[in-house]
């Protein structure tokens, strides 16, 4: 039944992945070793979207864990849910990629990739009806970015008709982890534009802001950030894992969200965001959820949608929510903010409902938006890329692994094209299209 194979690559991907598995194990009533002790049949009904059933009422995540050094894997294995994963599904090298995209994509990563694909193949063969793949990784490093994109293109080759969703941590404007981040990110975006069906952009800085501003945490840890990401990942996949009134899956999401194949980079948000202690004091209503969900401060990527327009967006509500109320609220938002939605896609907001809320909440909503303002994010990376590339700074690390400067130029221009495509559709209006159409008609007649 509609299984998904999950891959996590690199340190960032493995940490987000671990948080995600912790979240959904909780939602499905599994303890740290995968034994089911839940209360509701609904938890079991579609367990097999993400879990394989083993003997003795035990469930094992359909996850492949990949890294080029053993450190992060050991940490996952030692963590609270480390006993959940199948031991054969840990695939790791010893050398590390050292934040070098070329090492992940061409040298070290390429040596390990066949081993990973064997595990992926084995997981895929065990599925009744494989729906697709999801991968968690960061775009700024070596393994998640370089090897992650290599895996995506290899899986694409072998399973061309399956969905490929990526949860990608993009470099943030102020907080930079490594100097060569702009290179790694640009090379990765170049790959994602071609090979991914939907990319959910997550950005550490936006997550920090949410933790500080909304959750009032004075010094948030990566654990807190990953917890936010896992809430969104769980929300996006709710409809697959629980029966709902209006269901959606990876493919339906893509069909509704991607008007043009290259423009598949989404902003995500989650509501209600309340600090850990505060949620028990107030009831959340659908209007509040909708309000909060569309608030720029809630977006997990550092671009403000008010600087662009939504091509499409999708909202997934969970809990005991009235269908009518949700539709009224969503229509309301669209009418009030009509200038932020392109008018040439008339019904560009999609809603899905699922009756089972996340743990500890009565209702929640997850927001996925395809906004032209995501170009800010690519522009920023592009500017940093250009600044360094003009001086050929740090290039020897990449050319030393057998890369060519040509490849950098290609990646740069592909990302610039992406930015201008977003801009083109942001500026497009209905009337333009009609005028062009009228001009074209007589030409056909002349022939």
Curated annotation (Swiss-Prot):
CDD domains: beta_tubulin (cd02187). Keywords: Antibiotic resistance, Cytoplasm, Cytoskeleton, GTP-binding, Magnesium, Metal-binding, Microtubule, Nucleotide-binding. The keyword Electron transport does not apply. Belongs to the tubulin family. GTP binds at residues 11, 69, 138, 142-144, 204, 226. Residues 425-447 are annotated as: Disordered. Tubulin is the major constituent of microtubules, a cylinder consisting of laterally associated linear protofilaments composed of alpha- and beta-tubulin heterodimers. Microtubules grow by the addition of GTP-tubulin dimers to the microtubule end, where a stabilizing cap forms. Below the cap, tubulin dimers are in GDP-bound state, owing to GTPase activity of alpha-tubulin. Its cofactor is Mg(2+). GO terms for cellular component: cytoplasm; microtubule. The keyword Ribonucleoprotein does not apply. One of its GO terms (biological process) is microtubule-based process. It is found in: Cytoplasm, Cytoskeleton. The gene is tubA. PANTHER family: TUBULIN. Mg(2+) binds at residue 69. This is Tubulin beta chain. Residues 432-447 have a biased composition (Acidic residues). It comes from Botryotinia fuckeliana. Dimer of alpha and beta chains. A typical microtubule is a hollow water-filled tube with an outer diameter of 25 nm and an inner diameter of 15 nM. Alpha-beta heterodimers associate head-to-tail to form protofilaments running lengthwise along the microtubule wall with the beta-tubulin subunit facing the microtubule plus end conferring a structural polarity. Microtubules usually have 13 protofilaments but different protofilament numbers can be found in some organisms and specialized cells. One of its GO terms (molecular function) is structural constituent of cytoskeleton.
